[in-house]
Amino acid sequence: MAAEPEDNCISFVEMKFINNTLYFVAENDEDLESDYFGKLEPKLSIIRNLNDQVLFINQGHQAVFEDMPDSDCSDNAPQTVFIIYMYKDSLTRGLAVTISVQCKKMSTLSCKNKTLSFKEMSPPDNIDDEGNDIIFFQRSVPGHDDKIQFESSLYKGYFLACKKENDLFKLILKEKDECGDKSIMFTVQNKN
């Protein structure tokens, strides 16, 4: 009895060594995709840390957390409602997202050089990289049904986190420690 070929498999017809690297040549590579992120529909969201403080963009264009009742969230919607664009990912690593805010102009969160800042830009429709400073992987936290974490696609093992600096609770990028770090956990309340 002959085995039936599976639809999601690639048949290889040849192997080549080039500069000490083994390459496989596919019989038909029409359906193969290069690594990229393709933009899907956005969600309007309010992001909170575990102290129930709301993430917002202050006058200095910094992402900070503050105590804020729901009525103030609505009144300050341009600074408190984030646009989370989801992206189709050619690899399976979690839900690929960008985090933007529309305060006068569109700005998108970047972790370039492991420092968070908002770049004045709209997220592009396609990103032809395996890792990018504006793409984060949104994942649920095991054992916490309503908690989310965001891992940088550019810096594996680095997550968005809340850190107290002086009197401010800031959004930062930090390497995850293995001791149940709660500073990297957030709740995301979708508005649409």
Swiss-Prot record:
Which residues belong to the propeptide?
1-35
The UniProt PTM text for this protein says: The pro-IL-18 precursor is processed by CASP1, CASP4 or CASP5 to yield its mature, active form. The pro-IL-18 precursor features autoinhibitory interactions between the propeptide and the post-cleavage-site region, preventing recognition by the IL18R1 receptor. Processing by CASP1, CASP4 or CASP5 induces conformational changes to generate critical receptor-binding sites. The mature form is then secreted and released in the extracellular milieu by passing through the gasdermin-D (GSDMD) pore. In contrast, cleavage by CASP3 inactivates IL18.
Q: Name one GO molecular function term.
A: cytokine activity
Places the protein is found: Cytoplasm, Cytosol; Secreted
Please verify whether the record's keywords include DNA repair.
no
- Taken from the record, one Pfam family name reads IL1
* BP GO terms, sorted: angiogenesis; cellular response to lipopolysaccharide; cytokine-mediated signaling pathway; defense response to Gram-positive bacterium; establishment of skin barrier; extrinsic apoptotic signaling pathway via death domain receptors; immune response; inflammatory response
Covalent S-S links between cysteines:
none
Listed A to Z, the keywords are: Cytokine, Cytoplasm, Inflammatory response, Secreted
Name the major location: cytoplasm
Task: Specify the domain of life of the species encoding this protein.
Answer: Eukaryota
Keyword set includes Cytoplasm? yes
Which residue positions hold the site described Cleavage?
D35, Y36, D70, S71
Q: InterPro entries attached here?
A: IL-18, IL-1_fam, IL1/FGF
Q: Looking at the UniProt record for this protein, which Gene Ontology cellular component terms does it annotate, in alphabetical order?
A: cytosol; extracellular space
Q: Of which family is this protein a member? A: Belongs to the IL-1 family.
Q: What does this protein do?
A: Pro-inflammatory cytokine primarily involved in epithelial barrier repair, polarized T-helper 1 (Th1) cell and natural killer (NK) cell immune responses. Upon binding to IL18R1 and IL18RAP, forms a signaling ternary complex which activates NF-kappa-B, triggering synthesis of inflammatory mediators. Synergizes with IL12/interleukin-12 to induce IFNG synthesis from T-helper 1 (Th1) cells and natural killer (NK) cells.
What is its quaternary makeup?
Forms a ternary complex with ligand-binding receptor subunit IL18R1 and signaling receptor subunit IL18RAP at the plasma membrane. Mature IL18 first binds to IL18R1 forming a low affinity binary complex, which then interacts with IL18RAP to form a high affinity ternary complex that signals inside the cell. Interacts with cargo receptor TMED10; the interaction mediates the translocation from the cytoplasm into the ERGIC (endoplasmic reticulum-Golgi intermediate compartment) and thereby secretion.
Name under which the protein is recorded: Interleukin-18
Which gene is transcribed and translated to give this protein? IL18
